[in-house]
Amino acid sequence: MRTYTPLIYNIYNVHIWVFTESQGQIGQMSPRGKMETAVSQGQHKQLKDGHQHKGRKLSEEIASLLRLKECRRLNPASYYTPRRTSQSQSLSGSTFKEYNEYVNEKDSSRAQRQNAAAVLSKLAHDFWENDCVIDEDIFEDSSDEEQS
């Protein structure tokens, strides 16, 4: 059984695990979808010495880590539970139903303008049908007229 030392490094979402045993290297994905590489103690010492003595930049260190043969990218889909389509459909169907109907109503402002134009043309037609007669009935509901 392999045991791990508590040395875990996180460099740009690449975790490096250091084995206490020198045999067997693995690469695996963490639960958050980050790539992890497990290296032996000898490789850890080489990486540590190379970083301290050569003074390499962090980007060079990351590039060398990614070139290691033990480092491989795994599919993160196996670590996440798939979302059911019925769940997403129910959310869109109930929560945002009124908003979606309002937003997706085709040409709502154009329809309102057309309705207003139709009402205005009907009123104009009624006015001209009555031979332009204005009687006192139109002033019954007006509050500006004096009541006698």
From Swiss-Prot:
Compartment list: Cytoplasmic granule; Cytoplasm
Key word NAD present: no
Expression triggers: Regulated by phosphate, probably through its PHO4-binding elements in the promoter.
Lineage: Eukaryota, Fungi, Dikarya, Ascomycota, Saccharomycotina
SS bonds (residue pairs): none
Keywords, comma-separated and alphabetical: Cytoplasm, Phosphoprotein, Protein kinase inhibitor
Gene Ontology terms for molecular function: protein kinase inhibitor activity
Name recorded for this polypeptide: Putative cyclin-dependent kinase inhibitor SPL2
Modified residues (Phosphoserine): 59, 86
Reported function: Putative cyclin-dependent kinase (CDK) inhibitor necessary and sufficient for PHO pathway-dependent down-regulation of low-affinity phosphate transport.
Primary localization: cytoplasm
Origin: domain of life: Eukaryota
GO CC annotations, alphabetized: cytoplasm
Keyword Cytoplasm included in the entry's annotation: yes
